Amino acid sequence: MNLRDLLSTQSVPNIEFSGISEMSRDVQAGDLFLAVGDSVGQKAHIIEAKRRGAICVLTDKSIPFGSDFSGVPVISMGDLATRRGMLASRFYSNPSGDLECVGITGTNGKTSIAYWIADLSSRIGVKTGYSGTLGWGTLGKLQPASLTTPNAVDIQKRLFHLLREGCSRTAIEVSSHSLDQGRVSDVHFDIGVFSNLTRDHLDYHKSMKAYAECKAKLFKDFDLKKAVVCVDDPFGKSIADYLGNRVLTYGLKGDVSWVATPSPYGYTVSWNTPWGDFENEFPFFCDFSISNLGAVIGVILSAGGSVKQLARELNYLKQIPGRMETISDKNQSCPCVIVDFAHTPEAVRLVLMSIRARVSGRLICVIGCGGDRDKGKREEMGKIVSELSDFVWLTSDNPRSEDPMKIIRQVASGITTGNYSVSLDRKDAIREAITSSQDQDIVMLLGKGDESTQEVNGVFLPFSDRDIAKEVVGGLI
């Protein structure tokens, strides 16, 4: 593409470029590099981009170091930060305009809802891509991802490739950070989904009010054709009131468009929807999984999906990696071990309450809190986990630049019983939790889910709760 066509002006150099990037480490030969941020950092990134073969640079600064940087033209564009998505969308020929884009936001449940939308939509004949915490692409061929929602350029690139792969729909996890930073501003969302709002990311947003306002952007700043909103949550009710007749409401209680009513055992669910009623059986422990499915059903049926097809395919629902993922079950001669991503106070509470109602032995929990994140939730996490578990192993969970023992002490300050132990080494904590448990016990490994690394002082060390649990369980059976 020519730079003049991208910027719609003849006042810039006549340069052809073959790609676009806003991360210097991702630049390939012939790319246009978009440099945004502080001047000192930009200079280092531009040097790296040039070394990697960037053919031109756009910057949001006034270029104190000259308009030509070692042979690479550097062009100033003061509003570049807000135009990155638009430029990338133009370069990739507006891919979201040719896809049915479903954006999912909320504190908890984004991954489950997006993953199941991609899974079920594809199985009823609508090839659907996925972008979120687990990676991006089509299920079974996901590429790794470091952020729930990528930067403004990469989201357009992903949509372009999904379109080329034959997708006609995509399910996108939309984080509050991405809404606040404008990363998805140039994605044309057709359907928006809201799952819930509970405490998280207050290290970034500073208040629940600011956090809620960011989540609301998906429903107020985009021209949605339809929204699917959980009104079990008070904030969800306010979104539904704002949207009026464009909204479908769902939940496990209250006056909603349809209601999912779990059986006493949590496996049989009767769905009462505007498109018809049907019933399914699920191997779920948690009511919130059923609530998440309510969102999925609402999206697929409101987009024209067949009730009959969907009801059939729901019986073959895929297990989501790291979300209530069972490593061993009650039919094996070892404790039941479950891996889950729950890392907020409300998510931990919901998971443990659901499991508490179904365990015949003891409920054992392995948990930590991430470093350089919301410190205010740590004591609350300790209180919740101690009240709902029979025994707790406190350990590390991506301590980042913080002292892991300091984090553990902050979590421990909320523990109201003496039934806990500390192990800095998460692998040792998992091993001890499983080997010291009985066959009728349930061991919950919370916080990391499907993550494959442990972040310590800027280094990402290979680490998987799932792999460690399988290794320990394998030695018991």
Which residue ranges define each predicted feature?
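N-terminal leader/targeting and accessory segments in enzymes
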Residues: 1-86, 90, 234, 259-261, ...
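ATP-dependent carboxylate-amine ligase
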Residues: 1-14, 26-32, 38-44, 82, ...
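Acidic, Mg2+-coordinating active-site environments of NTP-dependent enzymes
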Residues: 3-4, 63-69, 189-336, 412-416, ...
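Short, well-ordered alpha-helix to beta-strand connector turns
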Residues: 17, 30, 54, 71-72, ...
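Short internal beta-strands
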Residues: 55-61, 228-231, 366-367, 391-398
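Short secondary-structure boundary segments
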Residues: 60-62, 174, 196, 231, ...
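Active-site regions of enzymes building and remodeling cell-envelope glycoconjugates
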Residues: 68-79, 143-146, 244-249
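Phosphate-binding loop of NTP-binding sites
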Residues: 83-231, 235-246, 358
